[in-house]
């Protein structure tokens, strides 16, 4: 019987709120430092000089107190996040023990402890986030790191995270290359200090981690870090083997952006890796069949509604769906998907007051079927470039559309209150699926007509000097 009730997400949220207090402390300290510690004497007499010196000394003491308050805040924030993660990990372990699923592939059920040395979590941000705040470190740690790897020291790893002409002066390739050097230095420094390391990467920094993994795998035997001392957690990975845009159009090169489509994160990496992808994320879950315009538009909208909105509570991450890998796969990467209930394509309609949600609910089930026809939903570990023609199973599609025709009006009536919440449909296509079974399975090729074309175009484009 359990006598303690804890809400890990509330602890993580509280940690985030406390971090806001710390930001205010730092801002107050910075604002007060100049005007108060360098007071000038009101006049040239001894009394004025003594008064100015006295108040300047008080100001310096106040600055020291503010520094100590800021340091205390940082430790308190990390302690709150650690408590939330500890509760989440304990709850997951208890649940697994009671249900007999301790060896399942669920994110919280697979505790990926490293060698047992003190653990450092090097965390990187996405484009436009070169250094993560204490608040974000605490949230990521609570949701993605501690539930799997246990207690650690979260460290913000600086990387440029630029993408000219949108953000900064570095092209995407330049930003990633500099990020790899910085990350490699950070990893080596921690390993040399006797620490194990888990690297967290999101979006562009997941590409940084991908290139670092490749570089480590290319080292001569004995020079790469021991796999028992290094691991990776990647979300919104643009190099995702089955869905990342840099793999969908592998070989392509855009000289006007200095952007290389350099393929998949190695599925045969010796390093323990946890990869999380949001369904319909236009960067990490890009359509396999781009002739499906609805899928393309939905993925484009998914950049805003999915890629920028990954879950950040331990409970949400624990509900990620494990994705199947190819028969006989013995790699060290675990693949998960966050299912997306509301199609990004319909989000603007949902924003219409009063009528938006009923309209979206009415059309979403059948629209989901049409959007899902742009995806092959093959094995997660197989690098899968884009292809032209989808092997559609017409019987499965007709059945799903027929079901959606009934589910849409039913969901719309629930949304306006004419039916109870219990009447909401509880099957596909109203609910999302990691594999709706709309395609014939003719295998999963890593070479397609579009990959050959994108590779050829990339070779020609590299003859053009990059603009960035």
UniProtKB/Swiss-Prot annotation:
One of its GO terms (cellular component) is extracellular region. Plays significant roles in mycobacterial persistence during infection and modulates host immune response. It comes from Mycobacterium tuberculosis (strain ATCC 25618 / H37Rv). The gene is PE3. Could be a prospective candidate for the development of subunit vaccine against tuberculosis. Residues 154-375 form the PE-PPE domain. This is PE family protein PE3. Belongs to the mycobacterial PE family. Residues 1-92 form the PE domain. Keywords: Cell wall, Secreted, Virulence. Pfam families: PE, PE-PPE. It is found in: Secreted, Cell wall. It comes from the Bacteria. Induction: Expression is high during exponential phase. Induced during hypoxic conditions. Induced in the lung and in spleen tissues of mice during the early and chronic stages of infection. The immunization of mice with recombinant PE3 protein stimulates the secretion of TNF, IL-6 and IL-2 cytokines and generates strong protective immunity against challenge with live mycobacteria. InterPro entries: AB_hydrolase_fold, PE-PGRS_N, PE-PPE_C.
